A protein has these predicted regions:
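Active-site-proximal loop/turn and secondary-structure-junction residues that shape catalytic pockets
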Residues: 10-12, 44-46, 72-73, 117-119, ...
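Generic structural signal for well-ordered alpha-helices
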Residues: 25-30, 52-56, 97-101, 134-141, ...
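Active-site acidic/histidine proton-transfer and metal-coordination neighborhood
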Residues: 22-24, 61, 80-183
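Gly/Pro-rich active-site loop or hairpin
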Residues: 12-22, 81-88, 124, 163-164, ...
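Structural motif
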Residues: 35, 106-107, 207, 239
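N-terminal pre-domain/capping segments
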Residues: 1-105, 179, 263-275
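Hydrophobic faces of well-ordered beta-strands that scaffold small-molecule active sites
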Residues: 2-8, 40-42, 64-71, 111-113, ...
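Short, well-ordered coil/turn elements that cap or connect secondary structure elements
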Residues: 1, 61, 146, 179, ...
Length: 275
């Protein structure tokens, strides 16, 4: 059964980004539980914050699961990327992600590689950069396997990376890895920019998709843009997808309203797909 999740950012430097709740982890968990979400997806400043803020205790208190943990603070706060041409910068990037893979894994959740993948160029050709990316994903995927969870790799739109922009691009990168424990994060906002047919792209990536960001075409809550969710939900059902639809969206018009609109859209979409 497909499950619902909502995002929480704890990174001040990411202010203005597409996260529903901000800063107050306990308040966000409480609101998520009251609205009926199954889980939360957390964007922490570092791995230590998950323990310092007692995320495990909050999940137990509010009867929530942890859908995933983002690693993007490594880029937003420290300008680290896994494909930096300078090895002295690549190693701290990998260590930063490793710490989150471990912290998330202990809580039964995967870590996400999105902005930390970086870009190729600036004196580094695509083959070299792709080697660095594949090497990092392989190592991190094997690390995640020790906790019984996958690593999630997110194709991004062309304005954010030049590695994988479509699910097909992402699948090609997965085929280069020395592990089968890396799955794709299908972000419906990025897909609305890059895919010719989002539903078809999802079906073609059957078996590779491990997580979905539930967002409309304008990065607002589903129902606030022009994405037709019906064929996408049928595609996910056809794939046998039973993971999370996680709202990585702007808090429009405010966090509480965005969360409420998201859970309403989630229920409507899953009900329609089941009929």
């Amino acid at each position: 059964m497909i499950k619902s999740a909502v995002t929480i950012s704890l990174v001040p430097e990411a202010r203005g980004g597409p996260f529903v709740f901000w800063d107050d982890l306990e308040g966000a968990c409480r609101q998520a539980a009251e609205l009926g979400f199954d889980a939360v997806e957390v964007f922490p400043p570092d791995a230590d914050a998950l323990e310092e803020l007692d995320l495990k205790g909050l999940l137990e208190r509010y009867k929530l699961k942890l859908a995933a943990v983002g690693t993007g603070a490594g880029w937003v706060k420290h300008k680290l990327r896994l494909t930096d041409p300078d090895r002295a910068r690549r190693e701290p990037a990998r260590q930063f992600v490793q710490s989150i893979v471990e912290a998330a894994g202990k809580l039964g959740a995967p870590a996400i590689i999105g902005s930390m993948q970086g870009r190729w160029g600036d004196g580094m050709d695509r083959d070299e950069a792709t080697f660095y990316l594949a090497d990092a994903l392989t190592g991190l995927g094997k690390q995640a396997a020790r906790f019984g969870v996958p690593l999630l790799y997110e194709p991004l739109n062309r304005y954010e990376t030049n590695f994988a922009n479509t699910l097909a691009d992402g699948s090609r990168i997965l085929r280069q890895l020395q592990t089968d424990n890396v799955k794709l994060l299908a972000d419906l906002f990025h897909m609305s920019i890059e895919e010719v047919d989002v539903a078809a792209a999802l079906r073609e990536a059957t078996g590779d998709v491990g997580h979905v960001h539930f967002a409309d075409s304008n990065r607002r809550p589903v129902g606030e843009g022009h994405t037709n969710m019906t064929p996408l939900m049928y595609a996910l059902r056809h794939m046998g997808y039973d993971g999370y639809l996680s709202a990585e969206v702007f808090p429009y018009p405010d966090p509480a309203s965005a969360a409420r609109r998201t859970i309403d859209s989630f229920r409507r979409c899953t009900l329609d797909a089941a009929s």
